[in-house]
């Protein structure tokens, strides 16, 4: 497959780099302890119960639905027990689940054993809508998407240590009999980010995630198909909330294998018409583009299309892609 790099794409693919956790693990509270900055919730797919309050290992939740029903507060931590397997489930975060610069919301793990595994199998569906046709009118711009983790207008959130899949193999998947290249296959993601009604969405960190077997639609390139994909939709009331964009997105130490269509992408926006001139001013980039995007020390293998793309991210404000290895694209 011939690889076409879009304008604004950054990808330094350095052979021999391995994916290692270079960032210290999150510090978590002792069992059952609330701190001045938040509560720790526990989720255990084997021994937990959704009748529990989730605030200790002995009273852990069982399903991710209980996490989605919470209104997380600044400083809250959600810990998934290692060895847990969450079938047909997804995590979905909203604006109301945001942390603060001083007290981010953290999603991590506890216990011993394999990573907690979220096997979404086409569940976790949500409605993507850019609010306007895209620069290429042949590209799909609205419809259903299935994502293992959805981060919608959530800021100051940090997620680490999870394993995510979202393929068509499960008996519970409504598309289990569809071909790999079916033009009508549902769009799927490991992690999808959406900025819409929160102005500039600050500080999203994805660290040490293992994302594999995500069989999204091979044709719908801007419908958050693939491993990790962050987009910007038209705000409900831009005059009130401001221009939607990202600042401080960090994607690091992640391993992605057999993801389709994209590997990692950040920044496609409803404001695409601001970027159609030959030369883009610093003012345009700073106003409409996303800033401080860092993609580093990741490993990608068997990507169905583009590997890593930063789309309309501000070139002067620390957009960086480095120490990343790509093995091969799917032929």
Task: Set out the residue ranges of the language-model regions.
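Bacterial Sec-dependent N-terminal signal peptides
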Residues: 1-9
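Bacterial N-terminal signal peptides
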Residues: 11-21
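Sec-dependent signal peptide cleavage junction
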Residues: 19-35
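Acidic Gly/Asp/Thr-rich repetitive segments characteristic of extracellular carbohydrate-active
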Residues: 45-82, 86-87, 92
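Extracellular beta-strand solenoid repeats
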Residues: 79, 92, 106-108, 117-119, ...
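Short glycine/acidic-rich loop motifs that flank beta-strands on beta-rich extracellular proteins
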Residues: 89-91, 122-123, 128, 145-148, ...
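Right-handed parallel beta-helix/beta-spiral solenoid domain characteristic of secreted/periplasmic
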Residues: 98-182, 213-219
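Right-handed parallel beta-helix
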Residues: 104, 113, 155-166, 199-215, ...
């Amino acid at each position: 497959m011939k690889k076409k790099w879009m304008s604004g794409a950054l990808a330094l693919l350095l052979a021999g780099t391995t994916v290692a956790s270079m960032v210290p693990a999150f510090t978590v509270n002792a069992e059952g302890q609330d701190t001045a900055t938040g509560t720790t919730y526990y989720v255990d797919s084997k021994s937990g119960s959704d009748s529990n309050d989730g605030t200790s290992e002995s009273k852990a939740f069982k399903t991710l639905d209980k996490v989605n029903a919470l209104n997380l507060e600044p400083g809250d931590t959600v810990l998934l027990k290692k060895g847990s397997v969450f079938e047909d489930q997804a995590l979905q975060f909203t604006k109301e689940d945001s942390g603060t610069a001083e007290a981010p919301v953290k999603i991590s793990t506890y216990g011993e054993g394999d990573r907690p595994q979220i096997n979404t199998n086409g569940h976790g569906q949500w409605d993507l809508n850019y609010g306007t046709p895209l620069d290429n009118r042949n590209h799909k711009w609205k419809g259903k998407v299935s994502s293992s983790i959805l981060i919608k207008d959530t800021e100051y959130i940090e997620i680490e240590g999870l394993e995510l899949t979202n393929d068509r193999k499960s008996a519970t998947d409504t598309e289990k009999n569809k071909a790999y290249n079916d033009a009508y296959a549902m769009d799927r993601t490991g992690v999808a980010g959406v900025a819409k009604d929160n102005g500039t969405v600050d500080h999203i960190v994805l660290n040490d995630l293992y994302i594999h077997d995500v069989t999204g639609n091979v044709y719908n390139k801007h419908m958050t198909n693939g491993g990790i994909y962050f987009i910007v939709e038209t705000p409900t009331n831009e005059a009130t909330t401001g221009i939607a964009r990202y600042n401080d997105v960090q994607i690091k130490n992640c391993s992605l294998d057999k993801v389709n269509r994209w590997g990692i992408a950040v920044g496609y926006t409803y404001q695409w018409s601001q970027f159609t001139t030959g030369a883009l001013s610093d003012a345009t980039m700073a106003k409409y583009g996303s800033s401080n995007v860092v993609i580093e020390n990741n490993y990608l293998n068997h990507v169905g299309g583009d590997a890593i793309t930063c789309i309309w991210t501000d070139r002067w404000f620390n957009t960086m892609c480095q120490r990343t290895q790509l093995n091969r694209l799917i032929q």
